[in-house]
Curated annotation (Swiss-Prot):
Basic and acidic residues bias (residue ranges): 1-10
Function: Catalyzes the conversion of L-ornithine to N(5)-hydroxyornithine, the first step in the biosynthesis of all hydroxamate-containing siderophores, such as deferriferrichrysin.
Listed name of the protein: L-ornithine N(5)-monooxygenase
Region (Disordered): 1-34
Record's cofactor remark: Binds 1 FAD per subunit.
Known pathway: Siderophore biosynthesis
Binding site for FAD: 83-91, 102, 168, 466-468
Catalysis: reaction(s): L-ornithine + NADPH + O2 = N(5)-hydroxy-L-ornithine + NADP(+) + H2O; L-ornithine + NADH + O2 = N(5)-hydroxy-L-ornithine + NAD(+) + H2O
Skewed-composition ranges (Polar residues): 13-26
Chain sites annotated for binding NADP(+): 254-257, 279, 323-325
Induction: Induced under iron-limiting conditions.
UniProt gene name: dffA
């Protein structure tokens, strides 16, 4: 019998040198159509982070005849993505040297939806000629830096339909026929972050995927030396420029970002004093055990969505240790080892170069200008029985305070303020259905128009909503929800006459 290796070699050098997906896509025309500003778009996405990028990929794949047996060959969607950043970036401020992903590379932007896609992480490695080298790492967890590069690689394929440096400022309902009672499109206004120029684009369907905004405790004043963890790698080095200087730096928080920053500071500024302040009594390990990890399975969204409000809240609380205020065990052990070595040298913790203050909170910050250190007033928090958890009060003088206290995910509320009157009577919140489509009054909005929310639906769709885990499968659901009729061959109405309305 002929060896399998020999069979693969015969007449098929491309099998080992170039995947079929690359052969198919290398010379293919763009499947998403760049559209002039004054034309009506089929889809406009506000934000071009991982969620919108996954939608672009899913839509591209849905139009690929090699992957989809029944695409409407006569239809090419008019789409646009507006992104405030000047280029694609994913948590650029937290690309800490040595940091790894916390999920398997198989949960990339395409594999779980269709592993034949040319946008898989494995195909990225192949295109970069690193597949065998990555395999030799024997890991499912790539470096965070590499995974961001993978997403940049994907994003480059859609550069023709993305307008970077455009900050969306409002969404306004519109009517093709002014005498009609039904809204049938939305005008999306954006501001160029460099020139301030205002642009307007119209779209039948709008996806709002803004991501999170930095959450800062109200006790903290406005001061450039107080910065969110999302700016750690980009802003702090520009402010504290001398890596040999003996700075005093504090970190606030008890989750993965806080731990990574605290650990990295000790290498980035080896002569500096660092202090980690946390309300919790200790760093707690994240639970990524197999059964618990099933909470991030795509089908669990259906189960979570079907629960009552009270049941959803209980579920979120029960699974909190998978994502909130927790740290990977490997990093906890590294930090504990560092603390132990200090204890060997000096049992007095107050004299340590690097300290952890558990059970504490910052109550007040004194700041007197850029040339004097800030003074942090720290005291012990109280538990449910009104008992002190930490050890009383303490004052710290610091050159910088890194705040790793998470993100708010409510930016869509201000953006959609002009659409509020279209919600069903008596509904005060932005309520998405299972397909992430916002519930709007059908007596006011045409079924052809709609708004979808991404990354802000944890209360209705579960813990995975703002994470990468289900992006691949969810993006397929989104494309089906938004464009299902077009893929089935439904006639798409001619909208070129709307151009004159802008």
């Amino acid at each position: 019998m002929e060896p399998v290796e020999r069979k693969l070699e015969i007449g098929s050098r491309s099998y080992s040198k170039m995947p079929l997906t690359q052969q198919r896509s290398s010379g293919e025309p763009p499947r998403l159509k760049a559209t002039p500003k004054d034309e009506l778009h089929d889809l406009l996405c506000v934000g071009f982070g991982p969620a919108s990028l996954a939608i672009a990929i899913a839509l591209h794949d849905a139009l690929d005849p090699c992957l989809n047996k029944t695409p409407n060959s006569n239809w090419q969607p008019k789409v646009c993505f507006l992104e405030r950043q000047k280029q694609f970036a994913w948590h650029s401020g937290m690309l800490v040297p040595g940091s790894k992903m916390q999920i398997s590379f198989i949960k990339d932007l395409a594999t779980m939806r269709d592993p034949r896609s040319s946008f898989t992480f494995l195909n990225y490695l192949h295109q970069k000629d690193r597949l065998i080298h990555f395999t030799n790492l024997s890991t499912f967890l790539p470096a965070r830096m590499e995974f961001e590069d993978y997403m940049r690689w994907c994003a480059q394929r859609f550069a023709h339909v993305v307008s970077y440096g455009e900050e969306v400022i409002e969404v306004i309902p519109g009517k093709t026929n002014p005498s009609s009672t039904l809204v049938d499109f939305f005008t999306v206004k954006s501001r160029n972050v460099e020139t301030g120029e205002i642009s307007a684009r119209m779209a039948r369907k709008v996806v709002v995927a803004l991501g999170g905004t930095a959450k800062l405790p109200k006790e903290l004043p406005q001061d450039p030396r107080i910065m969110h963890s999302s700016k750690y790698c980009t802003t702090l080095p520009a402010m504290l420029k001398d890596s040999r200087e003996a700075y005093n730096i504090a970190v606030l928080g008890s989750g993965q970002s806080a731990a990574e920053i605290f650990h990295d500071l000790q290498k980035r500024y080896p002569n500096s004093k660092t202090t980690l302040i946390m309300r919790d009594t200790a760093m707690r390990p994240s639970d990524d055990s197999p059964f618990v990890n099933e909470v991030f399975n795509p089908e669990r969204v259906d189960k979570f969505f079907s629960l009552s409000s009270a049941e959803r809240q209980r579920s979120l609380t029960a699974d909190k240790a998978t994502n909130y205020s927790v740290v990977r065990l490997e990093l906890i052990e590294q930090i504990f080892n560092d603390m132990y070595l200090q204890r060997v040298q000096n049992p007095d913790e107050t004299q340590w170069q690097h300290r952890i203050l558990p059970g504490r909170k910052i109550t007040r910050v004194e700041h007197y200008g850029p040339h004097r250190r800030m003074r942090l007033h720290v005291r012990a928090v109280k538990d449910e029985k009104d008992s002190l958890v930490g050890n009383g009060k303490e004052t710290l003088e610091v050159d910088a305070l890194m705040v790793a206290t998470g993100y708010n995910r409510n930016a869509h509320e201000q953006l959609l303020k002009n659409v509020q009157h279209l919600r069903p009577a008596g509904q005060e919140n932005w309520t998405p259905n299972r397909e992430y489509r916002v519930e709007l009054d059908p007596s006011k909005v045409n079924a052809q128009a709609g708004i979808w929310l991404q990354g802000c639906n944890e209360q209705t769709h579960g813990l995975s909503d703002s994470l990468l885990s289900i992006l691949a499968s969810r993006s397929g659901e989104m494309v089906n929800s938004i464009f299902g009729g077009e893929f089935a061959g439904t006639t798409v109405p001619d909208t070129t006459h709307i151009r004159a309305m802008l």
